[in-house]
Each structure stands twice: as C-alpha cells, then as structure tokens.
C-alpha cells in the first residue's frame, strides 16, 4: 500500500476506540509479536491525565506496521474492539473530508468491522467507524476512503440499499459548520410551526379553524397519548413560508379556551437540544464573567457562623451582594462564599481576612474557583513535583535509588533528613503581622541536620528509615513511560518504560503499572489509586494516620490540633505534603504560628 503520498507515516499507526484503562504496557504486549516497536504513546487529557481513547504505535519496519493493520484491526482489548488506521501527520486530509462518506439509519447490530467489510469492496479504506453512546449504536457511522472516486462509487451503489433489512442513506460527509449553515438557511424558510399549551378540547378540526385564516395548510396534527388524550401540543404545516411566519406573528401569545398559546417554528429534537445547550453555555459564561474576581471562597468557618455573621465580618471591606454559608441538614459544612460588588473590594478582603481568626478558627479566604479549575491547578502541581529525591552532600542514601533513566512508573517517594526540592502548596494560614514570630525556623531550600536542642516542632523524622527497599535491577523496554498522577492515571511521555524483574517490592496499580507511593514508618505504602478506591470518609483517615505520625515527631504537644488543621486541606494537597517534608515543615510552622496568635488573643481578652 502506498501511504506516503497521503501524508501517512509508513511505520506509524493510530489505534482508536481504546478502553480508558488500556496502557502502553498492554499495547506493547499485544503488538510486540508483530515486530520491533520503537515507541508507544497513549494520549491523555492535559488536566485529568485520563486516556483520550487513542494511541500511536511506531514500528521499526513499515512491513510490520502494515501487517499489524491487516491482522490486528478490530481486535478486542478489555472487552472493547480497537480501530487501527495509518497515522496522518498532515491533518489536511482529515479536515478536507475528501473521500469521507456518511451512513445513517444503520441497524443496531452493525459494528465497525461489519461496516468495514461492507464498504471495503469499493476501494481502500483509511478508517471506518460506527458512532456509539452509553446505550449502544446511534445508528450512523463514517467510512473514509483513500480516494474520492471510491467514495463516490460507494455512494452511487449503497445509497437507498438495505443493510440488515433497513434502508440506509449514504452521502458525502459534511462538516458541522456546513450542516449548521444549511440548517440555518432552512430555518429562515420554515413552513412547519409548533403549537403548545393547547386546551384538552382542541382537536385537529379546531386547530385547523384557528390557523386557516393565514393560508393553505398541508397538514394539521394534535399529538395524543396511548389513551387518545391530547398531549397539549400539535403541528401545523403551511404551503408557504410567508403564511407560516404570519401565523407565528399573530397567534403566539393569543388566548384560546382560557390558555395562552405558544406558536413558533417547529424544530427537530437535536436542533432544540443544541440550541438549549448553546443558551445554557452562554448563560454560564455570562455568570462566570459577572462573578470573576469578586466572589470569595471562605473555608474553615466556625460552626456558630451563619449567613448574617459572615456578611457582618466581611462588610467592612465593601458592598456585599451575597453571603452564603453552605449547610447540610441545617448544619454548617464549614465553608461559604462572599460576593463583593467590585474586584478591588474582594482583593482587599482576601489580603486582610486570610488567616484571621473568627470565632475559634483561622479563616482561609481566596478567590472562588470552579472545581475544574482547582483540579487542573492541583494536577499541574502534582505533575511538576520532583521526579526523585535529591540527597544532600552530608547524607548517605538509606535506600536503593532506581537507575538514572526516566522512571516515573517505578518511582517511590521517600522522606529523609536530606533535601527534597519542595513543591509548596498554597498557604492556608497566615499569622497576623502583629503576632509573635514562629518558634520554628523558616524552611530553607535545603534541610540541614537539626540538633536536639532546638524547638521540638522542627525535626521531621525521615520516612526513608524503613525496611522497604526498591531493587535497582530493571529491564528497560524502549516505549513510553507512565507518570502516575492524581486519580491513578498516567501521562504519556517519550522515554523508557521500566519493567522490574520478578520479586521486586515496587507498588503496582490494579493494571500492573507501577505507581508513586508515599512511605511512612509503621504504615503501608500509600498510592493515589489506593486513595481513590477508598470511600470519602476513609480517605481522610488514611492520610490523617500518616500525617499524625510525622507531625508527632515534629511537634508532639500540638499533634492533634495541627493534624486537624491540616486535614482541612484537599486530599491532593495533603499528598503533596506527605511527599515533601519541607512543605510539611512549612505547614506545621504556619499552624503553630496561628495557634500562638490565637492563644495570645485569648489571653488578651481575659485580661
């Protein structure tokens, strides 16, 4: 097959319709018997790191790639047939639509393979696909031929033919923009109108009498249920667009039998859904723009604070348009929102109120973010964390480190008294300027050995002082690596996948892919997938047990209070703290400072 002239790589394949849990390792095991593989990459979402459902495989020899295309297409992986085609580096062919045809009214049993087999007689096929949703086939699909002539031949032969006793439509593919333009043109010349809010006694004859004054009608229909009762709406189809438009202008909002009619252009369900979705997105965007920079998120609220008290606390900084404490069964959930009239007022409130104690707790105040934005930020923080511990010159390694090659999947995270380049989460507590200095020295970029005469809140036990060791014997396979991130999914990056020999103690996910793990003495290794699999109420407990052990060694007198304060953070931020002793050290300092300020304020109030 001559693929080079069409922008295809002679040895690169596109593999689509992948199950979300399919990894590079699985694809390597499946395709490696065909021939030598240079690289495999599963494409993933930038924010969530979840599979997008397709991958690219580069073979060393073009003949191996062609053999894989011929023999492995529609093979089943994890209960789902895959779809293979040549990888097109130039998107022009796909976007032009040349040779691409659209087939609709397909019978439900026709799948990708059946569609491919049916149309392969007309020419070489680049790809074929039946569109599915959660309920099964949607009844239409696409076949992309290598040439326009083959596509035209398929249309001339198959359009109007029976496939599995169902007459199908076959035509040239049209882009969404072109279809919407044609739909808009048809909408301007509509003749069919929709009449809603009809009284139960209005039948076809009554409806015809109401609209006959506007012109000649082709059909009139009142929709009824299975019992023959009116469903309260119907359709009137005129011969001319002008007549239909006149009927809409005069009858919309008119009272008939005590009810106000709605009269408008009749729309198909897909068109109505598309318009409603567009309106919803427009309203959502307008709402986000309206509250951008003026809506504040307030966390760690005392249980005694209600809407009025929250508004009173923040009212000194400007005009508040709304203040709401989120509740569940009339009990405060510990957080709320305050919306100001201008961004300047909101910024001032964040600056002055973040870290201030209201009631018995220090507040966390920040600009409100949508859940998707917050998750994306935390995901990027997690991805930018150091790939391996950096040991300082004064410390000898207390565990085996993996070889110096890209090894994201096999990397376990260890604590030590040496330095780990910190990944600082956003601070949640800020001591007031008039408060006393912290008894804990500020965290530096390199953690130095600490003497036993210093404050008991500044010595973090090294979590690498555990017996679990990761062997350094690895077999290197030259395919893409998996970097495990939040949610247990990995990001595909060029490099080498490290496959450990049998008998290693590295932590594995449910799919056999190694994951980053947090080791704390006295506890099992903790991975992101283990955390995600646990119920919500157990996730905080799993993290809290490990935090308590580390905080107890650093600041025993205040262990319980500091642990409780840190558990107010999101789980992903807590994982960042567990992986970086410097970040945890900084958080402990902040918590101690806040508690000291609170203690002094209580002492002042008593005096």
Curated annotation (Swiss-Prot):
Query: Which SMART domains does the annotation name?
Result: PolyA, RRM, RRM_1
Free-text disruption phenotype from the record:
Knockout female are infertile, produce a significantly lower number of mature oocytes compared to wild-type female, and do not generate 2-cell embryos. Upon stimulation of maturation, PABPC1L-deficient oocytes fail to achieve translational activation of stored mRNAs including mRNAs for CCNB1, MOS and DAZL.
What PANTHER family has UniProt attached to this entry?
Answer: RNA BINDING PROTEIN
| Listed Pfam families | MLLE, RRM_1
Localized where?
Answer: Cytoplasm
Protein name per UniProt: Polyadenylate-binding protein 1-like
What does it do?
Answer: Poly(A)-binding protein involved in oocyte maturation and early embryo development. It is required for cytosolic mRNA polyadenylation and translational activation of maternally stored mRNA in oocytes.
Q: Keywords in alphabetical order, please.
A: Cytoplasm, Differentiation, Oogenesis, Repeat, RNA-binding
């Amino acid at each position: 097959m001559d693929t080079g002239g069409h922008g295809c790589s002679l040895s690169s394949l596109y593999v689509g319709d992948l199950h979300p849990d399919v990894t590079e390792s699985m694809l390597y095991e499946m395709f490696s018997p065909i021939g030598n593989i240079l690289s495999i990459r599963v494409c993933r979402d930038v924010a969530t790191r979840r599979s997008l459902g397709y991958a690219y495989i580069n073979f060393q020899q073009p003949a191996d790639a062609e053999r894989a295309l011929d023999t492995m297409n529609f093979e089943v992986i994890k209960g789902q047939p895959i779809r293979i085609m040549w990888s097109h580096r130039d998107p022009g062919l796909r976007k032009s639509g040349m040779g691409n045809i659209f087939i609709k009214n397909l019978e439900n049993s026709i799948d990708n393979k059946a569609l491919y087999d049916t149309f392969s007689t007309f020419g070489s096929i680049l790809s074929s696909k039946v569109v599915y949703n959660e309920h099964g086939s949607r009844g239409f699909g696409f076949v992309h031929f290598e040439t326009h002539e083959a596509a035209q031949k398929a249309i001339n032969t198959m359009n109007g033919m029976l496939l599995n006793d169902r007459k199908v439509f076959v035509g040239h593919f049209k882009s969404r923009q072109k279809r919407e333009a044609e739909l808009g043109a048809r909408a301007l010349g509509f003749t069919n109108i929709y009449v809603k809010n009809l009284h139960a006694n209005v039948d076809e004859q009554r409806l015809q009498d109401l609209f006959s004054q506007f012109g000649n009608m082709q059909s009139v229909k009142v929709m009824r249920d299975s019992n023959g009762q009116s469903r309260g709406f119907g359709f009137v189809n005129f011969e001319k667009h002008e007549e239909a438009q006149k009927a809409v202008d005069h009858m919309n909002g008119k009272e008939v039998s005590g009810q106000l009619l709605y009269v408008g252009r009749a729309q198909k369900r897909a068109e109505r859904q598309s318009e409603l979705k567009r309106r919803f997105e427009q309203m959502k965007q307008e709402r986000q723009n309206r509250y951008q920079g003026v809506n504040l998120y307030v966390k760690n609220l005392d249980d005694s604070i209600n809407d009025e008290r929250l508004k009173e606390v923040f009212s000194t900084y400007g005009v508040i348009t709304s203040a709401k404490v989120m509740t569940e069964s009339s009990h405060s959930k510990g957080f709320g929102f305050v919306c100001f009239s201008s961004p300047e007022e909101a910024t001032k409130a964040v600056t002055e109120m973040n870290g201030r104690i209201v009631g018995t707790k220090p507040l966390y105040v920040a600009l409100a973010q949508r859940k998707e934005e917050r998750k994306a930020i935390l995901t990027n923080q997690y991805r930018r964390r150091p790939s391996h511990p950096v040991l300082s010159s004064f410390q000898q390694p207390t565990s085996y480190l993996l070889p110096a090659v890209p090894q994201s999947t096999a990397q376990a995270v260890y604590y030590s008294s040496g330095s780990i380049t910190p990944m600082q989460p956003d601070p949640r507590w800020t001591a007031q300027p008039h408060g006393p200095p912290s008894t804990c020295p500020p965290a530096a970029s390199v953690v130095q050995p600490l003497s036993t005469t210093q404050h008991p809140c500044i010595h973090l036990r090294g979590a690498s002082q555990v017996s679990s060791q990761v062997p350094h014997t690895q077999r290197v396979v030259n395919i893409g690596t998996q970097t495990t991130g939040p949610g247990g999914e990995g990001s595909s990056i060029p490099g080498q996948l490290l496959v450990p020999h049998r008998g290693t103690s590295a932590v594995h996910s449910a799919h056999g892919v190694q994951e980053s793990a947090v080791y704390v003495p006295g506890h099992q290794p903790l991975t992101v997938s283990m955390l995600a699999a646990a119920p919500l109420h157990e996730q905080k407990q799993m993290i809290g047990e490990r935090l308590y052990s580390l905080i107890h060694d650093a600041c025993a007198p205040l262990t319980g209070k500091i642990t409780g304060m840190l558990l107010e953070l999101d789980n992903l931020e807590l994982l960042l703290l567990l992986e970086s002793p410097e970040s945890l050290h900084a958080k402990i300092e902040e918590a101690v400072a806040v508690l000291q300020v609170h203690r002094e304020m209580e002492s002042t109030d008593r005096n």
